[in-house]
């Protein structure tokens, strides 16, 4: 199976984690698009979705799925999203689609986080994929200097403005051995909206697409 077929496979597998009558948290990205397409097939059995991005909201509405604002719900039974990297403990790098802040907001509402990804996203240590960081424009240079002190290079993602009107720095040259400590530190830097390490909101389950089928990892 190619990568697109693996994404379709895990997108469909994630339906098993959607309770009947529920509002489901929906992430952002190409793998999530496959989940949204699958979700459309059972839309009569759910109340709707809370979306983490404008793009996902548009796709959900195109499929006839009702979209609720995050502020309108107190909790969600499940949040389903992809990952750019996931480690053996369920910690992730996310934000390749520039929706990391809203993804964390929706993930925080959810009782469990189900990650859907192909097998290439499973790594021993986070950091090979460029780490996205959402930042205020006036703080870009300061934050770049902070990462330089860590031996990393932070580059502004050209032509990208987040749904929150901010910029994305992509950081290369990191090896994140303690994701929780790293997330906590970077989130305290003035001007950082959020860093794309998901350790406080790590996956409960990962549905990993492999040539042999879906492999379920529980954390």
Curated annotation (Swiss-Prot):
Reactions catalysed, as given in the entry: aldehydo-D-ribose 5-phosphate = D-ribulose 5-phosphate
UniProt KW Isomerase keyword: yes
Keyword annotations of the record: Isomerase
Its EC number(s): 5.3.1.6
Leader peptide range in chain numbering: none
Highest taxon in the source lineage: Bacteria
GO CC annotation, single: cytosol
Residues the entry annotates as binding substrate: 28-31, 81-84, 94-97, 121
A GO MF label: ribose-5-phosphate isomerase activity
Active site: 103
GO annotation, biological process: D-ribose metabolic process; pentose-phosphate shunt, non-oxidative branch
Pathway field: Carbohydrate degradation; pentose phosphate pathway; D-ribose 5-phosphate from D-ribulose 5-phosphate (non-oxidative stage): step 1/1
Coiled coil start-end: none
Alphabetized SUPFAM superfamilies for the sequence: D-ribose-5-phosphate isomerase (RpiA), lid domain (SSF75445), NagB/RpiA/CoA transferase-like (SSF100950)
UniProt family annotation: Belongs to the ribose 5-phosphate isomerase family.
Subunit structure as annotated in this protein's UniProt entry: Homodimer.
Stated role: Catalyzes the reversible conversion of ribose-5-phosphate to ribulose 5-phosphate.
Listed name of the protein: Ribose-5-phosphate isomerase A
Protein's organism: Methylibium petroleiphilum (strain ATCC BAA-1232 / LMG 22953 / PM1)
Lineage, top ranks: Bacteria, Pseudomonadati, Pseudomonadota, Betaproteobacteria, Burkholderiales
């Amino acid at each position: 199976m190619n990568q697109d077929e693996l994404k379709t496979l895990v997108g469909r597998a994630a339906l098993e984690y959607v309770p009947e009558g529920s509002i489901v948290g929906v992430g952002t990205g190409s793998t999530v698009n496959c989940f949204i397409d699958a979700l459309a097939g059972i839309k009569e059995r759910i109340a709707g979705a809370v979306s983490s991005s404008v793009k996902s909201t548009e796709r959900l509405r195109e499929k006839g799925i009702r979209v609720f604002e995050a502020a309108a719900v107190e909790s969600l039974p499940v949040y389903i999203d992809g990952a750019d990297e996931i480690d053996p403990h369920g910690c992730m790098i996310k934000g390749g689609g520039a929706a990391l802040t809203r993804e964390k907001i929706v993930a925080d509402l959810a009782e469990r986080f189900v990650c859907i990804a192909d097998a290439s996203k499973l790594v021993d240590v986070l950091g090979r994929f460029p780490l996205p960081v959402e930042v205020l424009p006036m703080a870009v240079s300061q934050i770049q200097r902070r990462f330089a002190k860590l031996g990393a290079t932070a580059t502004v993602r050209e032509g990208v403005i987040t749904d929150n009107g901010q910029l994305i720095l992509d950081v290369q040259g990191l090896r994140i051995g303690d994701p929780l400590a790293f997330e906590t530190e970077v989130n305290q830097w003035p001007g950082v909206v959020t860093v794309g390490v998901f350790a406080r909101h790590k996956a409960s389950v990962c549905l990993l697409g492999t040539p042999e089928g879906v492999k379920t990892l529980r954390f």
